[in-house]
Structures are given as structure tokens and as C-alpha cells.
Amino acid sequence: MPTIAYHAPIQTLVAVRGHPFDRTAFDAIFQGMEGISATMVDQPAAAQLMNPDGMTPYDALVLYDMPGLDFEATENRPGHVDPGDAFRAGFSALLEQGKGIVALHHALAGWPAWPDYAEALGGRFLYRPGPLRGRDRPDSGYRHDVAYTAAVVAPEHPVMAGIPPLFPMQDELYLAEMFEADVTPLLRARHAFVADAFHSAAAAMEGRMFDNEGWTHDEGSNLIGWTKRAGNSHLVYLQPGDGQTTYDNPVYRRLVENAIRWVASMSPRKPTESRAT
């Protein structure tokens, strides 16, 4: 059991829950980061901290959560849960303040009832068809354990420091909504992002896992990593992160660490009295 790193120069809040994951294996990513302390908080409690007051002790927020989806809904699964006015106001204020954010993998599906959340992250994974940016969009696609090559497209960016130009990955990929015009691309996947290569998320909700029969989707973006401004915050999204194969990948660990260090360096400094002495 890791101890509490009160004196770590970078304090990070890591929001989790909403999608299955191996907590111990995921936490090991952060235990290997020198000078970074990660405090893991489950949703829905994590949402109570996502405001300027709640995030005062932290230099960065990592999103590995998937809030706002009710998988026990009796119809139209998953149901969409409204985040509430208090969360919307607090999270918006956090972005206005400029707190750095790193969003990973399934975080792209979070808070589907709040369009501004997708705008902040730079995209949306849709579990069922619905409106997005004024257009009706199909449900998104997923494909587990895809062996592919990831390609760095912004080698000079600090998040790409020490990352090889090309590196192998084996992870889940999404055929989802990426707002490419609003982001700075960092990573692309060499893979065919077409409906035939993915499974329907809505079919999975109907009990038909790994099925795309009758499902159609436009050809999608191969973008799997980007940075953007969300209000005054610097945000990095990394699409990989489905399970232990990726958690243990040293290149992935370097990506996550680089992203945390970069967004923390771009965040407003904490008050001196909030640091451990």
C-alpha cells in the first residue's frame, strides 16, 4: 500500500469509476512517477471536488472516470444523468481558473447530458445515437485489443518528449466523435477507422457484444491524442488506456507522466499555505 506523498512537488487528483478497470494495475502507473503524488477518488464523490475550492491542493486533474451514465436504466440504456447546476458551475469555474487536466480513454464518454463537457474534452464517445453539435449522430464504435502502430504527429510538443516517432500498441480503439478542428493533434493510430472494423456501442447495451450488424457510421478520425484549451485550462486527452497491457507499456506511462507534468506546469500556482511543510 503506497504511503501519502505529502511533499511531492506535483499533487494530482485522479477521478475514477463509471467503467470497469483494475484499480491496482492502474494505480501502478502513478506510483512510478517521481515527484508526482496521485490521490484517487471515486465518482460521484470526485465530482464534489471539481471546483476551484476542492482542487486547491492539487496541481492537475486526471479524468479516468465515466460519470453521468446510468447502466441500470430500464430503457434507453445507458440513461443520461444530469450533472446538476452546482457541478456545472464548479467545473466551469475550474476551467476559467486554468487548472490543468489530463483525460484518459473512457473519460470521453462522461456527462453525456452536458454538451459543454464534450466541448471541453474535444470529443464525445456516444453509447447510443443522439444529437451532437446540432446533428444527429450514430452511436460510437469500439474494438478491444487492437494491435496497431501509434504515430507521433507533434514531436516538438512537451507531451511527446522521449516518445518514439512510431511505437506499437495493443489496446481498445474508438470510432467516436473527435472535434479535430478545435484541438492540436499529438498522436494518430495507423488503423482503419471504418464501421466494419468496429462494434456498435448501442448493440452492446442491447446485449449484443462485439456486433455491428445493421450499424452504420461515417469513416472516423484516427486521432488518439491531442491537447486543447478548455477555457483557460490546458487539457490533454489520450485515447489509449483500456487495461493492464497498456498500463504496463512504458511508452504509455511516459505519455501520461509527460501530460501531467505539462498541464501542471501550465496551471496557476497553488497558494503557498496549501503545500505541505
Please give the residue ranges for each predicted region:
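Extracellular ligand-binding/catalytic regions of CAZymes and related secreted enzymes
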Residues: P2-P9, A204-T277
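Short, glycine/charged-enriched secondary-structure capping and boundary segments
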Residues: D27-F30, E75-P78, D116-E119, S200-A201, ...
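Short, solvent-exposed loop/turn segments at secondary-structure junctions
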Residues: H19-P20, P67-G68, L108-G110, P165, ...
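A glycine-rich, often tryptophan-bearing local segment used as a flexible ligand/cofactor-contacting loop or short
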Residues: G68-G162
